Amino acid sequence: MDKSKRLFTKSKRSFRRRLPPIQSGDRIDYRNMSLISRFISEQGKILSRRVNRLTLKQQRLITIAIKQARILSSLPFLNNEKQFERSESTTKTTGLRTRNK
């Protein structure tokens, strides 16, 4: 092959199938916190189906389980750890008063 044709050939990489995030033995339940916490972002949002690589039925069951866990307060609605860190760092003391900036 000459150089002009060699530029357009694709390299053949091996395709490795990813493992499904939910195994067949896993029960999707609001009490299974180790399973549910894998599908929640750092901000406490439910991750999309495309990010999770779940089927439609699995995503629906995960969403229902997360909402049940939030209502029963075993899972927070929001994850406010970053907001607390930011508010503590912006507090300034001026004389006897403390001000939040």
Curated annotation (Swiss-Prot):
The keyword Ribosomal protein belongs to this UniProt entry's keyword annotation: yes
Tree of life domain: Eukaryota
A GO biological process held by the record: translation
Gene3D superfamilies referenced in this protein's UniProt entry, alphabetically: Ribosomal protein S18 (4.10.640.10)
Any GO molecular function: structural constituent of ribosome
Cell location: Plastid, Chloroplast
Cited Pfam families: Ribosomal_S18
Coiled-coil residue windows: none
Family statement: Belongs to the bacterial ribosomal protein bS18 family.
Record protein name field: Small ribosomal subunit protein bS18c
